[in-house]
Structure formats: structure tokens, C-alpha cells
Amino acid sequence: MPRPRAAKEEETELLAQHQESPRPSSDGSEASASSISTTSLVLEHINDGGFNGARSKVSEKYTDDGNGDLGHARERFDIEDGKFHPLTPVDKKARRTLWIVGTICAVGWALALVSFLMNGNYKHSSTRPHDPDASVTKGSGKKITLDNVLGGQFYPQSQSVSWIAGPKGEDGLLLEKGVSGKDYLVVEDIRSKGNTEAAGDKFTLMKKGNFQIGEDIFIYPSNVWPSADFKKVLVMSEQQKNWRHSYTGLYWIFDVETQTGEPLDPENQSARVQYASFSPQSDAVVFTRDNNLYLRKLDSQKVVKITHDGGSELFYGVPDWVYEEEVFQDNSATWWSEDGKYVAFLRTDESMVPTYPVQYFVSRPSGKQPDAGKESYPEVREIKYPKAGAPNPIVTLQFYDIEKSEMFRVDIDNDFTDKDRLITEIVWAGKSGQVLVRETNRESDILKLILIDVSKRTGKTIREENVAKLDGGWFEVSHKTTFIPADSSLGRANDGYIDSVIHEGYDHIGYFTPLDSDKPILLTKGEWEVVEAPSRVDLKNNLVYYVSTERGSMERHPYVVALNGTDKREVMDHSGPAYYDSSFSTGGGYALMSYQGPGIPWQKIVSTPSNTEKFEKVLEENKALEKMVQKHELPILKYQTIDVDGFKLNVLERRPPHFSEKRKYPVLFYQYSGPGSQQVQRKFEVDFQSYIAANLGYIVVTVDGRGTGFLGRKLRCITRDNIGYYEAYDQIAAAKMWAAKKYVDAEKLAIWGWSYGGFTTLKTIEMDGGRTFKYGMAVAPVTDWRFYDSIYTERYMHTPQNNPTGYDNTSITDVHSLSQNVRFLIMHGVADDNVHMQNTLTLLDKLDVAGVENYDVHVFPDSDHSIYFHNAHKIVYDKLTWWLTNAFNGEWLKIQKVRPKAQADARSLGR
């Protein structure tokens, strides 16, 4: 398939031999006469067709050069243009005037030279630091290629840090696995990286990356989890993926002192386990196998089976598909109490949940070979998948008393019914024998926080909030509730917890104490929002660390505040815009600060305000990325806000290098638009959108419209019960603004997105009907929200039974309006277990019935939602590039009037 590529080396070498006089570059600056600059000037016209003969329109790139063809450019600098004029004498007055003018010019030239040298403009672009706020590209550089982007060549290098608490509560300890030159699994004091005398010794947990069981079994770890006392390591080998977050494996217990291992279940060592975890006391392991829960006490070889009826429709200790995907984003539904006396776990009953078949035509993910004679049939995996309005799994919280070997549940007065309950978070309240349980109703707009005393086997609701009455919105799933134990010596009279709260229309954090209090001490407030907070609590110093958007909704900065809500301050001193990701040590004394943009990303570990001993260690500076960036021409980024119906929306415009307002550019809109999401961020990123702008010469615009996150609940929750309407409306409103700009070709506007972005793409071109956007590209789109999973969809739409009109309105049904666009593209993975292929197939049927044909379709066998199977990921982006280039080259306009060649020739002869 044709795809824009860099010029061949032999073409570049030949053109570099052409020496021309300097001419103004496209950004207005004077181009150098070096062979490098001359080559770049000539290469701007390679795609005009003059060098390589006739080329198909499909392979043509849009050019942002408005200077005409190369032949005319050469004529302007040809010394033989025009007639030869003989020299004539100059009189004295004219000579004096020339001297004065010459002197003025010389002085001006000298001043310009000084400014030129002081500003570093004499340097080639490849030697200048990356400037993320540059408004123009100067000089020349390599073009970004699609292979650069898909190959991750512009992806920042980063180091992951696994903080781990010491057996005696030591802070600042790291768990390092497989580091070159070290033992396989090591616990190291972070201060040793700074060579300070206070650093503790390294502690080896596993010397080698493999060990032996018996005479013939060799174990190669897929993952490892140390016990809290560092005396044992839980090892998983032969990992096999299940869904997005879940997997199975063989589990082993490794003894640190003897450096030997044994099976987790000595009597069934080859059985695959779904999840396992150490007790906080390091004396037992609880695990799930075949959907039943088991316990192994390490002082015994015996395994105790806690549950007995687990199976294909009943899960213990692990989530089903929808809870894994939409609630926990994890493979565990098991929680040890801090004192190791109890295990809390979910019982998930899927017996009433309908199944959805996912077909695999090429591969066999089960690993099972079909019976003889059935090899030609696809493998079908039946998934229990609750769609909107369909029966949900029945989930209940169970407890197991280790000492008494008893399993029980605690009933709560006025609790949600089994069919209307979502259990979204479990937090043990220290060693008190109490547990906090967060529940919402099925439609996620009523929250109940329940406190259970497992020793007394009683419980009660301590907080209840109805957000539908507050602002008409919903509760998102959160897993950041943090227990704060009482400590009178530190001024904490009662137990409490930190939780997210809604304050004056924005998401903040509050401290609830005692545990049954429903009135928080506000830790943050203002017209900005905290992000997944708290990040860490320093109990010794009563400090709370969190990340927020206080500096700007497109930025992220870490802060610290006292537990009483006073003395708030920033953790990092950064004067300009910045986007930080923060990972704090277990005690809060250290933090890995990952600066993600807008400049070149870097990482360093620093001491926090909790720590009296100052520490700083740079881990990553991305020097290689800096050099890579300097050698390439990146898009010009313009961050801005626009006003749509009184709402301020964040926008990122990516302009081509050498952008000129005197030219007319096609514009591609890229968006995701999902509830609470954000695409316009001050991060460093060179992605597919960067490639489109920098290589193809198109403008790429991203608008975070209504419904997206971090600008307050009013903007976010307006979409409830009618998702797709405001998202599409805002994309169209923004497109009209761009269409009116003098540097935009209003006939060449397109929009694309993936998943929710694919849905919004189709909804936008459906609403617009070809009046503003002419083209759309949708990958893995939802086309009818009745087809998507219940927990996600009903959070924003209620159930179809309670909101039938909303579901009708939000579905893609106006195929006549779709036919008014020039053309659109749909792509989907056939084995998508998330957004089912049913969405695309149903829309195609509607198009067929209506006789609509102005679209293209590409499906990918055996690919799931990420579309990776058998080179599919590369093909997706190749197809997007090729299809968009054809669109902006006018090819799709031509095929609207296509006729058989014989007929066309006959008409031509008849003229």
C-alpha cells in the first residue's frame, strides 16, 4: 500500500551536489547556503513529480509550499536571466550617497551579526535544545516517519521504581529485579544511589533468575512478590494471559535463606492459579484456583479449600470480566486484614449474565487443538458479558476467619438489593478488625460507605450521598481511600480515612474522623481538581501528598498539605508549565518525580518535605531522545482555549513545520471525548498525530469538549443520559472556527478516533451531515450503547429501561446524514471482547438497507480492541494514513462520479 516515505538516499546525494544561492525559507528566515540547507530546499519539491516522473495521486503528500514549481524557483536565481548591461560611471554626489548608505548598512549588518551570534541562530537546528513552545521551525531537519512513531523511537525512556516497606517500617527501600550486574531480586536503600553514609545495606532475595524443583523441573519467574518479612518470595512461572488484567500461572514459594523453592500446593504443583498473595504476617498464602479460594499456611504442607462451589459461573477471590474491566482494573478481588486474621473476598455469581461469543478464525487462544475433523471450524469463546440493561453479576462480600476456619457475610440494614449493588472498593481499617466498603447502586449515582466490624459480625452505613440530586452526575470508581489510624501523641484522637469529596462543583479530598463521621475536614478546595488522590500519607508528620490541576487543567503538579488542611505547598519548584507523574515511597520520605513534558522528559528521585535529610538522584535525562528530537522537524504546538456556549474548552493545534498563514492547510481533528478523559495535556509526545502534521503537512487539532475531565463537574456531567450529543456538537463548533481561519482549506476537514473516539467520530459526521466535516475515520467504534457493558454505560446513561429515548438518540442511526459526507472509514477487530464487532456489523446493516455506499471497511481477524494480531497494528495506521491522504488529495470526490471506462471514452468522443 502506498505510504509517504523519506526520499531515497541516492536522490538526496544527487541533489546535494546542486549548489544554489540562498533564498528565504518558508518561515521567513534566511536559509543557509550549505549543502544541507540547499538539499532541504530542493527536497521540498521532490513530491511535485518533476524528478521521478508521473506519480499516482494516492502516493502524493499534501505540500505546504506555495512557491510554485521547482523550475520557476531555479529561474529566479539564474544568472543568465535578462540582458547584459554595460557599466557606466558614477558621479561624485551619487558616490557620496553610496558611501553613507554603505556605512549605515555595515553598522546594521554588524549589529545583526552580534544579535545572530548571541541568540545562537548560527547553529543548525540539530544542535539547538528542544523548545516545546516554539512558534516556528527554523532550519531543516529529518521528517518524522510512521516507522519512527510505531517503533517507539520517540518514546521517552523511563525507569520504574517499586517502593517496598521494610520489615520494621523502613522507608526509602526499592525492589529491583533483573538489573544488570546485580543479583536477580534485590532490596536496596535508595540512598545508596546517592552514595550517602546513611544508606543501608543491599539485601538479596534471589541470587539467580531461576531455580530448580527436584531433579528435572527448572523454574523461570514471570513475576515475583516478596513477603513482608523478606524471608519468602512468591514466584509465578509460565504466565498465560486471560483478559486485559488477568492471567494464570504456576506458583512457587521460594525460601530466601536456603535459596530453594517448593510448589505452592505440594500435592498439585502443575495446577494453574489465578491469583495468590502473602498474608501481612508472611505466614500464609491465599489463592484462587478454578474459581475456588484456598489457603496454605507456610508451617504446613497442607492446602485448605475455603470454598467448594466455584466454577464457570461462580467466582471467589477474582473478578469476572466486567468487574476486572470496569471496577478493579486488576486480577484480584481478595483483601487480607492487616493483622492477618481475616480474608475479605468477593463472591461473584454470573449465572444470570448472558453470554457473548467471540470468534477466532486464525488462532486458538485456548491452546487446545480441535478434535479430528473439526480443524476447519473457528474457536469460539463464550464470555459472560452484561450489556446495558441486561442482568449484572450478583456480587457479595464474604469473609474468612483464619483461626476459626469459618466463612461468613455480614448483612447491612437498608443495603442495596443484590441486583442493584456494585461493590467498588474494600479498605481494611488497620488492625481494628473493621473494614470500609464502598458501594453504589447499579446506575452509579447513589453512594454508600459501609463500616463492618468483622469480629462482631455487624455493620452499618456511615455515609450516603446522592449525586444525582446534587448535580445530576455520577460517581466514578475510585481506589484511593486511605485509612488513618488514631495516634494521640501525633494529635489524631480517632481513627479516620481520607476520601474524595465533591466541593463546589470540583473533585477534592477530605479527612473523615472518627470513622463514622460524615463531615470531612477539607484538605483541598478551589476551582481545580485533585487527581487520583491521595498519592501518599506520611503518618509520622501528618502530611498528605497529592497531585492536582491547580496550575492549569492541562498540567499536573505534586503538592503536600497538613492533615488539618493547612500549610499547602508544592513539592517541586517549577516555574513553567509542567506535567508530573509522582510515585512516593511507602513512608512518604522520597518520591520518584517523572517530568513528562512539555520539554524532554526526565526522572529523578528526591526527598520530600517530610524528610529532613535532603536527597536527589537523577535516574533518566533522555539524552538520546533529545538528540533524536533535534535532528527531526516536529510539529508546532499551539495550546489554547475556545468558548463554546459559555464553556471554556482546551484545544491543541499541531501545525506543520514551516507553517505559514499565507497557505491553505487541510485539518484533521483527533479526539477521544470519553467521560472524564483528557487528551489536551502539556506532555511531550510524538505520536501518530505528530506524524500527520510533521510529515504529511496537515494541521491536526484536538478539542477536549464537554464531558471530558479536569475542568469541573458542570462541564463533565452535562452529557449524562445523552452521551455523544455535546461531544459531537463541540467538535463541529470547533471545526467551524477552524474552517473560518485564513490558513485552513475549509473543504478538507476530517475527524478520527478510536473506541469512544470512534463513536464520537461517527456521531459527529452524523450530526454534521457533511456541512463542516467532509471525512471521518472510526476505529473500533461503539454504534449503539445497548451493546456495551452495563457498569460503564449505565454510569453515564442510566439503564435502557429508565432512559429509552436517550439510548435511541445516542445510537448511530441517521444513515441518510452519513451519506451526505464525502466518505468515511470504519475499522474493527473481529475478536474484540470489549467493543464487540456487533457494533460495526449492525451499522453496516443499516447502511445496506438504506443503500448508503460512501464508506470503506477493514476488519482484522482475531484482533481484540487494541488490534495487534498478525501485524494488524501497523496496518491500522498505514490504512489511516493512506485513506486520509486520498481524502485530502480529492480522490474520494472522484470516485463519487466514477463511470466505466468505455462509457467515459464514448462521452469524450461525443463532445
Swiss-Prot record:
Residues 119-911 are vacuolar. Coiled coil: none annotated. It comes from the Eukaryota. Residues 25-39 have a biased composition (Low complexity). It is an enzyme of class 3 (hydrolase). Pfam families: DPPIV_N, Peptidase_S9. Gene3D superfamilies: alpha/beta hydrolase, Dipeptidylpeptidase IV, N-terminal domain. GO terms for biological process: proteolysis. It catalyses: Release of an N-terminal dipeptide, Xaa-Yaa-|-Zaa-, from a polypeptide, preferentially when Yaa is Pro, provided Zaa is neither Pro nor hydroxyproline. The active site is at 755 (charge relay system), 832 (charge relay system), 865 (charge relay system). GO terms for cellular component: fungal-type vacuole membrane; plasma membrane. Residues 1-97 are cytoplasmic. Type IV dipeptidyl-peptidase which removes N-terminal dipeptides sequentially from polypeptides having unsubstituted N-termini provided that the penultimate residue is proline. Residues 1-39 are annotated as: Disordered. Glycans are attached at residues 268, 564, 809. This is Probable dipeptidyl-aminopeptidase B. InterPro entries: AB_hydrolase_fold, Peptidase_S9_cat, Peptidase_S9B_N, Serine_Prot_S9B/DPPIV. Its EC number is 3.4.14.5. It is found in: Vacuole membrane. Belongs to the peptidase S9B family. GO terms for molecular function: aminopeptidase activity; dipeptidyl-peptidase activity; serine-type peptidase activity. Keywords: Aminopeptidase, Glycoprotein, Hydrolase, Membrane, Protease, Serine protease, Signal-anchor, Transmembrane, Transmembrane helix, Vacuole. It is a single-pass type II membrane protein. The chain crosses the membrane at residues 98-118.
